Each structure stands twice: as structure tokens, then as C-alpha cells.
Amino acid sequence: MRDTDFVARLHRNIVLLGSQLKTRFKDHVVLSTSLALFAALLLVIPFYGCSPAASENAQGSSTAQTEAQKDQKETAPEGTVKATSFYSPTLGLDWNYDVYLPADYESNPDKTYPVVYMLHGLYGNHRNLLERFDSSAMLDEAIQTAGQGAIVVFVDGFNSFYIDSADRGLKMESAIMNDLVPYIESTYRVSKDRRDHAIGGISMGGYGAARFVLHHSDYFSKGILLSPSVWTTLADDNFIYTSQHAFSDGTTSWSWDLYKQLFPTQYLGEVDPSQVSFFVATTSDDGVVPVADVDAFVEQLKNAGINVDYQRDSGDNHNWKYWSRVAPTAYAWALDQFKSADSK
């Protein structure tokens, strides 16, 4: 209904009702006129706004909502996370780990999958990357997008820095390579192709993952390093000197010399640079591992001819908020790398 039609209808109703009311209220002209106007408005106002244009707008809005619903992505198929353990001869204990199996794992009994080992940070455990942020949901989405599945193992590394401690500490590096990796391969359908083997981690775990790729490149080909603890220097009052013992040399809790001897880049000479690659992410606002230290580490990798996808941004800090922001991209990178390797 157009505005001119509305006015005409309003006028007709006022005149009609005015005449009727004047007949009944002859001595109250003002009252009758007011009542007529009020009644007319009550009659026609409900119809105002139900014009073809308004109706079309409502219909268009409904259509847009329907189309938007159609465009929404289907919920990604959910993988399965199993919490379990096995006995590690190297560590001399029942060793906890979690494993993520892609949604199609059980329905494809003859299929093998790439594997990613994920390492937690200092003071953490194997549950961190599943509880502090939802790695399972992230992997579901990444797998759906990439069209590439993977088995992901969440390792309990204690506070070991994932090395073989020189002074009565854990032999974590040996435990992973000699106990965990063979056990995972015998228990789950892991691809034997080294191009399908990746390892990643946050903070201390990023340091460990870098060492495994460079020191064990015969098995690992890809590394995911999120805020890796690759310090070039530490302030004299840094808490690490007194609170950690992984790099103890028997005389001090933290031996800077031992840390340097085991630093990941010490193994660059063992690596064919064309056979390994890294995803590295950090923020310039990191207050634990200075971005300059990560820059220097990445530069060493690149100078050695290694392919590095380096994502440096700002905001957040050395914390779960930052890692939850970059982890989906890291997982997607690994899956894309696996898919690319399979196509060659």
C-alpha cells in the first residue's frame, strides 16, 4: 500500500465515523471528532507498513537467512581422543600419553596415516594441548579443510626439555625415540614414510621439537615450533637457573654451556636441508622468549637452506591465549605438508 492510499483511506474513515458520532453526540462536536479520528487510526494503522515493499523486504530477509543457513559449513566429523599409557623401559615407569585418531580411522582398517607428536611446555603435561585449548576440535576442522587425516600423539615430557639429562635426570630423548615411537607404530596404523612424520610443541616443547627434527631427521621431516624456547642469552636473575635441572652438569642446576652444546642448531651439519621443513610462530610481545632470539634461530635455519614458514605477529604473550590462536594454523600447515608429500 502506498502512502497516498493510506492518507485517502484515513480521510474516508474519519469522515464516515465523524458523521456517525455526530448523530449520537450532537452536543459534543469536539468529542465526536476526536473519537472519530482515534477510531480511524485504530482501523488503518495495523495495515500501514504492510505495503508490497515492506512485504518484499521481509521476504528478502527470510530468503537471505535461508541462503546463509545453506552456506554454513557442515560440522566437521569428530576424531577420537584416547588417554592411555604404556611401560617405558628407558624411563622405568608407566608413561601416559593421549592419542588423537581421525574420524575415519576405524572405518578404514587398511589405511595408514601420517603422525604428529606434540610436546607440551614447562610445568605442563600431555593433557595441556587438549584441555588448555581444544586440539581435538582444531584437528577435526583442519582435517576436514585439508582433506588429509593424521594421528596425533600428545607426549608427557615432564620438565625434561626433551633431552637426555646428563646428571641423573630423565633420558627423555632416548625414551621417545626408543620406546614411544616404536610403540606407537606397533599400536596404530602409522605411515612408515618419513615424510609423514612431524613433531611439534609449545615453548619448551618447541625447543624439543626442533632438536628432534634436526638430530633425528632420519625419522622426522617436519617441525611445528610455537614460541620455542631458543634463548641466545638469559638474564642472571632468570628463574630458569634455579628452578630447572634438565641442563644440570652436576655442579649447577642450569649449565649454560650444556644448554649450548645441545642447542638444536648444533645438528645442522647432520641434515639434508631439502628433507626437512619448519613452521615457526611467535609474537613480538613475548615476555619469556624474546622475539629477537626466535628471529636469530629462524635465520640460522634459513641460512642452512631449510624451508621455514615463519609467522611473527604482535599481541598476547607467551601464553595459552596466543598458542590457541596460532595452533589451528600450525595444524593446517602440517596437514598441507603431508598432502603435498603424498602427491609427489
Say what each PLM segment does.
Residues 16, 27-41:
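Sec-dependent N-terminal signal peptides
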Residues 23, 36-38, 65:
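Low-complexity, intrinsically disordered segments with a bias for serine/threonine
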Residues 48-49:
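C-terminal motif of bacterial Sec signal peptides marking the signal peptidase cleavage site
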